[in-house]
């Protein structure tokens, strides 16, 4: 007797197969399973931000005007953080704070938590989209892994930092000038520029920009068979199918310039991936430290000597005084509910004064 072993064919596809077929179909804009997370969250995050910057005031949370309706422009409009008194409330529209009143919800800062949480999940959805597409076309997932850097920075700055502080109030508001104010806040209250994790982040981002410029220029410089014109801009053909730059020539050039050069394309491109992503991750780790109020470098001996000797001052001690000034002025402005009043004689003065 012969037994035929084979796969049982289903007469009708189940719901999962139907959805999988539709979601992963080849179309102009790929949807995918990741799109179920990405597209709704990105839509709500961007929609909330445009709504907030256009219509919603920050008078009730920060005592500020923050919308186009109140006279702000693109650089000064923002979706502001909730009031300090609301601590870490999720500020759900149907929660005990707003009780389903949309106007009250906006006044309390509910749009900020709405944008922050949907924005975080949208970024995660975008990373999953890169994983999904890479798997579909049989690529390695380095794009998705690289995108973990921006996600780490967003989550650490907008979510973990305020969770470590007293409330969402101390997170950055979503706006250009608001982010600048937050940077000054980080400097004044945490001496962020002297933090080694910030230094690694700066080195990563600026180093990546340098590597990108060097790499692009080198490839352009070593192109061949791209046309018969003497001028690169006239001869270069962006639709050229095959790779026609000379790695050997590039290696020879940089060997003469620096004494060392990349001889392997994979190592070169991995290094270009590694530098910025590591920098972003280091910055994110540093911000998590600040959430716990960890200090960076404190050169106390210089501070003591500067306090005792009117003629001794370093760039560090001058910066410390600047930080004290930022704290003294910013705390009173940012937290009017605390009724902070600093007499003139306690405001910081440098030895030069």
Curated annotation (Swiss-Prot):
The chain crosses the membrane at residues 41-61, 125-141, 153-166, 208-228, 279-295. The modification N-acetylthreonine is found at residue 2. Its main location: plastid. It catalyses: 2 a plastoquinone + 4 hnu + 2 H2O = 2 a plastoquinol + O2. The keyword Acyltransferase does not apply. Chlorophyll a PD2 binds at residue 198. GO terms for biological process: photosynthetic electron transport in photosystem II. Pheophytin a binds at residues 130, 143. GO terms for cellular component: chloroplast thylakoid membrane; photosystem II. The modification Phosphothreonine is found at residue 2. PSII is composed of 1 copy each of membrane proteins PsbA, PsbB, PsbC, PsbD, PsbE, PsbF, PsbH, PsbI, PsbJ, PsbK, PsbL, PsbM, PsbT, PsbX, PsbY, PsbZ, Psb30/Ycf12, at least 3 peripheral proteins of the oxygen-evolving complex and a large number of cofactors. It forms dimeric complexes. Photosystem II (PSII) is a light-driven water:plastoquinone oxidoreductase that uses light energy to abstract electrons from H(2)O, generating O(2) and a proton gradient subsequently used for ATP formation. It consists of a core antenna complex that captures photons, and an electron transfer chain that converts photonic excitation into a charge separation. The D1/D2 (PsbA/PsbD) reaction center heterodimer binds P680, the primary electron donor of PSII as well as several subsequent electron acceptors. D2 is needed for assembly of a stable PSII complex. This is Photosystem II D2 protein. It comes from Sorghum bicolor (Sorghum). The lineage of its organism: Eukaryota, Viridiplantae, Streptophyta, Embryophyta, Tracheophyta.
């Amino acid at each position: 007797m012969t037994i035929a072993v084979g796969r049982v064919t289903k007469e009708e596809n189940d719901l999962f197969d139907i959805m999988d077929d539709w979601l992963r179909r080849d179309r102009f804009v790929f949807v995918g399973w990741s799109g179920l997370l990405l597209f709704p969250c990105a839509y709500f995050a961007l929609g909330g931000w445009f709504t907030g910057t256009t219509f919603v005031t920050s008078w009730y949370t920060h005592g500020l005007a923050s919308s186009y309706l109140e006279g702000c422009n693109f650089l000064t409009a923002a979706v502001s953080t909730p009031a300090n008194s609301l601590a870490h409330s999720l500020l759900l529209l149907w929660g005990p704070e707003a009780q389903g009143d949309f106007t009250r919800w906006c006044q309390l800062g509910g749009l900020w938590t709405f944008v922050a949480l949907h924005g975080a999940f949208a970024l995660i959805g975008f990373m999953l989209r890169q994983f999904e597409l890479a798997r579909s076309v049989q690529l390695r997932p380095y794009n998705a892994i690289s995108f973990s850097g921006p996600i780490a920075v967003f989550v650490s700055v907008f979510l973990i930092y305020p969770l470590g502080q007293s409330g969402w109030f101390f997170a950055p508001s979503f706006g250009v000038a608001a982010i600048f104010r937050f940077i000054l806040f980080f400097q004044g209250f945490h001496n962020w520029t002297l933090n080694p994790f910030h230094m690694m982040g700066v080195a990563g981002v600026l180093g990546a920009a340098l590597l990108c410029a060097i790499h692009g220029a080198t490839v352009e410089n070593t192109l061949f068979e791209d046309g018969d014109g003497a001028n690169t801009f006239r001869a270069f053909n962006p639709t050229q199918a095959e790779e026609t730059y000379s790695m050997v020539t590039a290696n020879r050039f940089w060997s003469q310039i620096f004494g060392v050069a990349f001889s392997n394309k994979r190592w070169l491109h991995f290094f270009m991936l590694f530098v910025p992503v590591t920098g972003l991750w280091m910055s994110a780790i540093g911000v998590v430290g600040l959430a716990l109020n960890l200090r960076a470098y404190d050169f106390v001996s210089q501070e003591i000597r500067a306090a005792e000797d009117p003629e001794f001052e370093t760039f560090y001690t001058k910066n410390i005084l600047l930080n004290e000034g930022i704290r003294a002025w910013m705390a009173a402005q940012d937290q009017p509910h605390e009724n902070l009043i600093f007499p003139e004689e306690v405001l910081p003065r440098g030895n030069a004064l």
